[in-house]
Amino acid sequence: KANIKPEDIDDVVMGCVLPAGMGQAPARQAAINAGIPNTSGATTINKMCGSGMRAAMIANDQLLAGSSLISLAGGIESMSNAPYILPKVRDGLRMGHGQVQDHMFIDGLEDAYEPGRLMGSYAEATAEAYQFTREEQDNFAIRSLKRAKKANEDGSFEDEMVPVTIKTRKGSIEVTSDEQPFNADINKIPNLKPAFSKDGTVTAANSSSISDGAAALVMMT
């Protein structure tokens, strides 16, 4: 899409928070699958909520420092493929109950310092601290959805999107547009129950969804 030869890219920096089960070095995999040679650098960044943006910042720093002339930066995430983890199974479970942990929760959606506390509760606390009302959050979400739908329908980002082919039991499916905006029913948004607090304002509709996606930027001096 950027009309850049793969061999001209000096370094690849990709954000990924849920890498379990993806195989080693997701950034290197992305680079190789894009035809970028092994002589180029490849680094995977794990930073909560902002790994893709942090990847772009690191690529920018490398360009300014002169360690790269052309860099590829972005993020890759597949929340639907996040596996379940079996702690202590490697050494063998003993008497008593074992536990299955959700990689998406334990390494992504739960706070590491307050076990069991979901990150969405911090969004709730932030909304309360800054007095963001439920109506304001819902209106923001609705406006975002409408913009996303319009952009998909009129092809605003068509030149920046690459079709993805998914193999299923019934055959191959080609995904050519962002599916998520069309899964939401805008009319139901104002009536949804709070997700993290009984009297809260954050809902499944006005917060981030469980989804898969990837994006990349070609950056140069």
Task: Go through each PLM region and give its residues.
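Beta-strand segments within the central parallel beta-sheet cores of soluble alpha/beta enzyme folds
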Residues: 6-15, 41-46, 71-75, 136-143, ...
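Conserved catalytic cysteine-centered active-site region
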Residues: 16-71, 113-119, 183-209
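Flexible glycine/proline-enriched surface loops and loop-helix/loop-strand junctions
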Residues: 107, 124, 128, 197-204
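Conserved active-site "lid/cap" helical segment
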Residues: 1-22, 26-34, 41, 125-134, ...
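Active-site-proximal alpha-helical scaffold in enzymes
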Residues: 45-77, 127-156, 216-221
